[in-house]
């Protein structure tokens, strides 16, 4: 999992990018 995930935004742990 990414260590820089934001609690307010769902993250795509496969792409390591904010899923927005």
Swiss-Prot record:
Species: Hordeum vulgare
Keywords: Manganese, Metal-binding, Mitochondrion, Oxidoreductase
Predominant localisation class: mitochondrion
Cofactor: Mn(2+)
Catalyzed reactions: 2 superoxide + 2 H(+) = H2O2 + O2
Domain of life of the organism encoding this protein: Eukaryota
Compartments, record wording: Mitochondrion matrix
Cofactor binding, per record: Binds 1 Mn(2+) ion per subunit.
Keyword Metal-binding: yes
The enzyme's E.C. designation: 1.15.1.1
UniProt cross-references to InterPro entries, sorted A to Z: Mn/Fe_SOD_N_sf
GO MF annotation terms: metal ion binding; superoxide dismutase activity
Family assignment from sequence similarity: Belongs to the iron/manganese superoxide dismutase family.
Protein name per its UniProtKB record: Superoxide dismutase [Mn], mitochondrial
Function text: Destroys superoxide anion radicals which are normally produced within the cells and which are toxic to biological systems.
């Amino acid at each position: 999992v990414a260590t820089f995930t934001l609690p307010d935004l769902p993250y795509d742990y496969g792409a390591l990018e904010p899923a927005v």
